[in-house]
């Protein structure tokens, strides 16, 4: 769980992973950056830019896999609306199925919303990427952009949520999902058990509707947590929208 591979072919986005607060988490050799923008075009990124980088990506992944004593699978974090997260990632997942067919692939997918859309082609990219996700992902956790904005605005009293607020909320969801891998427990001891315990039908890779996992626990603002009493029944009640 400690090895990461990060890819980015879009040079127009800020390189926060290289210069941000958490830059020391990622090894510099595992940060791959391209010089060409896919312009939010799924076909261009999937069939052109993706083919240019696939050998480099697979080589870096192979080196990380060789360092693992027992490779269980892959956790793929990506967005479905723009650039690298949709087109190149879907192409990479196809090759992961070819080279690591027996290894589990868990995807954490950020779905776009009309209220916070930044590109007109996001619906098209999402549909095309979803098809690949259904075919090559063993278990997919969907995160709705609008839902996390509503949680920050309505439940956490954040008037103008920043990317830091959104990422911290998503990190709490990922942390709760992977808790059984990091701590002792009876369920989900390894990645292969996620699909068995969470997916109802073999033809379905998504265990929950968008952001259902985040609704399992009530959220409190940072200002109210000092005086707000947190009884156990309130923590166990789901958040209603």
UniProtKB/Swiss-Prot annotation:
Recorded GO MF terms: GTP binding; hydrolase activity; metal ion binding; structural constituent of cytoskeleton
Assigned EC number: 3.6.5.-
Coiled coil: none
Top-level taxon of the source organism: Eukaryota
The record's account of how the chain is modified after translation: Some glutamate residues at the C-terminus are polyglutamylated, resulting in polyglutamate chains on the gamma-carboxyl group. Polyglutamylation plays a key role in microtubule severing by spastin (SPAST). SPAST preferentially recognizes and acts on microtubules decorated with short polyglutamate tails: severing activity by SPAST increases as the number of glutamates per tubulin rises from one to eight, but decreases beyond this glutamylation threshold. Glutamylation is also involved in cilia motility. Some glutamate residues at the C-terminus are monoglycylated but not polyglycylated due to the absence of functional TTLL10 in human. Monoglycylation is mainly limited to tubulin incorporated into cilia and flagella axonemes, which is required for their stability and maintenance. Flagella glycylation controls sperm motility. Both polyglutamylation and monoglycylation can coexist on the same protein on adjacent residues, and lowering glycylation levels increases polyglutamylation, and reciprocally.
Biased composition (Basic and acidic residues): 1-10
Disulfide bonds: none
Alphabetized PANTHER family for the sequence: TUBULIN
Family: Belongs to the tubulin family.
Protein name: Tubulin-like protein alpha-4B
Taxonomic path: Eukaryota, Metazoa, Chordata, Craniata, Vertebrata
